[in-house]
Amino acid sequence: MFPLLGLFGGTFDPIHKGHLALANELIQKLPSLTEIQFIPSRQPPHRPSPLASPANRLEMIKRAIANQPNLILNDVEIKGNDISYTINTLKILRPLFLTHALCFILSTDAFADFKHWHQSSVILEYCHLIVVNRPNYRLPQQPWLSDLLSHHQTENAEDLGRFQFGKIFFQTLSPRPISATQIRHYLAKGDYEIVAPLLPKTVLAYIKAHKLYQQ
């Protein structure tokens, strides 16, 4: 059996308690998943540029995951100078973790757009996909999606450790409708009390100290 290494990509603009809860619950529900690496993107392919700088986003993640040994910061995409394509990241990481099964973590709505990812046809040659539920979201009925799942989906979590790549596993998690977009909206207006329950204290303190996301 291969130990599982979780790869959690995103802008983390800013990282919030929903991100942390997702990672920790995944580790609880998948015992073979002993580590999740947070991989902030420099420039996501299908989204606007993050508002916070790469350096600020890295620092916020460091503060958010401090004292949580199962959660690790990986700056591989921040070090790049181009668009942060998942396939390029996987090609860098695969040789570094030859004894692990890489598990790329994504939401159901991101998975519904998987066909349009850069070199999506070869991504599953490098990793598994762990698709986590998003509140009140159902996958669209698309022929390409049905075909992909018929070849790669497994309902047995142990398959993620039996193979190093090529499986798609759906994991149901507790609903956490926290939106970074909404958080930025309130931060722009200086409504710190509203966002305080949604952000780690150390992250909110950093945002205040550096006046991030202000209009």
Curated annotation (Swiss-Prot):
It catalyses: nicotinate beta-D-ribonucleotide + ATP + H(+) = deamido-NAD(+) + diphosphate. Pfam families: CTP_transf_like. InterPro entries: Cyt_trans-like, NadD/NMNAT, Rossmann-like_a/b/a_fold. Its EC number is 2.7.7.18. The keyword Transmembrane helix does not apply. GO terms for molecular function: ATP binding; nicotinate-nucleotide adenylyltransferase activity. Pathway: Cofactor biosynthesis; NAD(+) biosynthesis; deamido-NAD(+) from nicotinate D-ribonucleotide: step 1/1. It is an enzyme of class 2 (transferase). Keywords: ATP-binding, NAD, Nucleotide-binding, Nucleotidyltransferase, Pyridine nucleotide biosynthesis, Transferase. One of its GO terms (biological process) is NAD biosynthetic process. Belongs to the NadD family. PANTHER family: NICOTINATE-NUCLEOTIDE ADENYLYLTRANSFERASE-RELATED (PTHR39321), PHOSPHOPANTETHEINE ADENYLYLTRANSFERASE (PTHR39321:SF3). Catalyzes the reversible adenylation of nicotinate mononucleotide (NaMN) to nicotinic acid adenine dinucleotide (NaAD). This is Probable nicotinate-nucleotide adenylyltransferase. The gene is nadD.
